[in-house]
């Protein structure tokens, strides 16, 4: 009997253990089903709050299934996209001089023109406080379906629009649908997305009578109307969903200034003109004041970026007197200093931007600043240099040729401006 009791006792214990294990398994399966079922119900949007100065890894946000919608009301950690450094990028550019040769201006097609080094292509911009995703051409086009862009300004604006078109052409080739008489203003269309990109030539953003040839040689001083905006861009402005507006370098040219249809002074004019030299900073301040006020008061629903002027890297001279740029890789901040003229231009731009934001308040909320000056200051290696012309040293390796240390090779550093712009559009980061 004793043995029989022990057997029954053991059996009861085993039965108890089996029931316990089974109950545990059922509970785990039910929990997993709950998490899986409801975790898949909708994307999770992560909001990061707290101390904005703390080091937090970038927020991963799952977007809606509708890829054409730009996410709104998504909080991500603050990050100054314009303060950082260039780091090695083994992947290199997303397009090549060959894949986008038809869009690129011949003067910026450095590799085709014979530039012997290619190391300048293998760098990318890394902000100090966050990661910056690689430009996603497909994502950009999906977001821009049925929308219109314009990049407005001088030849650097043209340089930038060509960069953007080349990056987007990895998904779909743009079709040129318009050009002006001198082929300076153009428009392209991406048919599959009904997306248009315009490049508007307006180097001063205000009305100007310019007397120079295709090589930039002037036969007379520019007649600049500081208080009259150039309708080449203002007429198009109300229809735009996005615009990048810039100016700067052209204000350094010799010019006569007009306000209220009367000459009021000049810059760089001869003493015999009997006019007061007001300085280019006066003209730039006055013009930008009218530009910024127009944008802020326009009540546009589009997103308008104002890009600061970008410094050149001429050494031992300038464009017209033998300046060169021979560096082949980025430099540290401590190794380069912005030129005085570039500082003056940038100061005017920052001051006018801050003024209009302060004065207009919410009326200026769609106006954003793109301050790429510091970012590109450390890339003296990214210019065509002597390779603005096709194979300039083939006939004479010691030939004296004009260098371009202002514009940017394509592909090249200017492509990474688009990384920053897409991050601002998608995640709402405004930089500073």
Curated annotation (Swiss-Prot):
One GO molecular function term? O-acetyltransferase activity
Subcellular location field: Membrane
Membrane spanning residue stretches:
13-35
Per the annotation, the residue ranges of the short sequence motif DCXHWCLPGXXDXWN motif are 404-418
Sequence motif: GDS motif, positions: 153-155
Q: Which InterPro entries does UniProt cross-reference here?
A: TBL, TBL_C, TBL_N
Q: Which family does it belong to?
A: Belongs to the PC-esterase family. TBL subfamily.
What does the record's miscellaneous section state? Contains 2 motifs that are conserved in esterases, but it is unlikely that this protein belongs to the catalytically active pectin esterases.
Relate the protein's function as given in its record: May act as a bridging protein that binds pectin and other cell wall polysaccharides. Probably involved in maintaining esterification of pectins. May be involved in the specific O-acetylation of cell wall polymers.
Name by which UniProt lists this protein? Protein trichome birefringence-like 23
């Amino acid at each position: 009997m004793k043995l029989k009791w022990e057997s029954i006792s053991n059996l009861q214990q085993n039965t108890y253990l089996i029931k316990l294990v089974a109950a545990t398994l059922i509970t785990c399966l039910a929990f997993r089903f709950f998490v899986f079922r409801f975790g898949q119900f909708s994307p999770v949007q992560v909001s990061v709050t707290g101390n904005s100065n703390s080091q937090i890894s970038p927020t991963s946000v799952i977007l809606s299934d509708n890829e054409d919608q730009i996410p709104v009301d998504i909080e991500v950690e603050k990050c100054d996209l314009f303060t950082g450094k260039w780091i090695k990028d083994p992947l290199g550019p997303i397009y090549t001089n060959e894949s986008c040769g038809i869009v690129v201006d011949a003067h910026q097609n450095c590799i085709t023109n014979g530039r012997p080094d290619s190391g300048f292509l293998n760098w990318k911009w890394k902000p100090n406080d966050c990661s910056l995703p690689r430009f996603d051409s497909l994502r950009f086009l999906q977001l821009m379906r049925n929308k219109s862009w314009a990049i407005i300004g001088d030849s650097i604006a043209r340089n930038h629009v060509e960069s953007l078109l080349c990056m987007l052409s990895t998904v779909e080739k743009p079709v040129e649908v318009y050009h002006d008489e001198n082929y300076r203003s153009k428009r392209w269309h991406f048919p599959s997305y009904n997306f248009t990109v315009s490049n508007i030539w307006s180097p001063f953003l205000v009305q100007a009578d310019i007397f120079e040839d295709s090589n930039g040689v002037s036969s007379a001083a520019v007649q600049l109307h500081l208080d009259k905006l150039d309708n080449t861009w203002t007429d198009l402005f109300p229809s735009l969903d996005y615009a990048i507006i810039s100016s700067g370098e052209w204000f350094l040219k010799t010019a006569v200034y007009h306000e209220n249809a009367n000459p009021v002074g000049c810059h760089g004019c001869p003493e015999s003109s009997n006019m007061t030299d007001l300085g280019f900073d006066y003209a730039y301040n006055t013009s930008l004041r009218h530009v910024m006020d127009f944008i802020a008061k326009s009540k546009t629903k589009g997103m308008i970026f104002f890009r600061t002027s970008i410094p050149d890297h001429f050494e031992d001279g300038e464009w017209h007197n033998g300046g060169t740029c021979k560096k082949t890789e980025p430099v540290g901040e401590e190794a380069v200093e912005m030129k005085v003229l570039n500082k003056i231009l940038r100061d005017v731009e920052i001051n006018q931007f801050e003024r209009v934001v302060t004065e207009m308040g919410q009326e200026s909320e769609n106006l954003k600043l793109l301050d790429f000056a510091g970012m590109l200051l450390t890339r003296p290696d990214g210019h065509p240099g002597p390779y603005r012309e096709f194979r300039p040293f083939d006939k004479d390796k010691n030939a004296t040729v004009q260098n371009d240390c202002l514009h940017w090779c394509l592909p090249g550093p200017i492509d990474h401006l688009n990384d920053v712009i897409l991050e601002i559009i998608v995640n709402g980061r405004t930089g500073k």
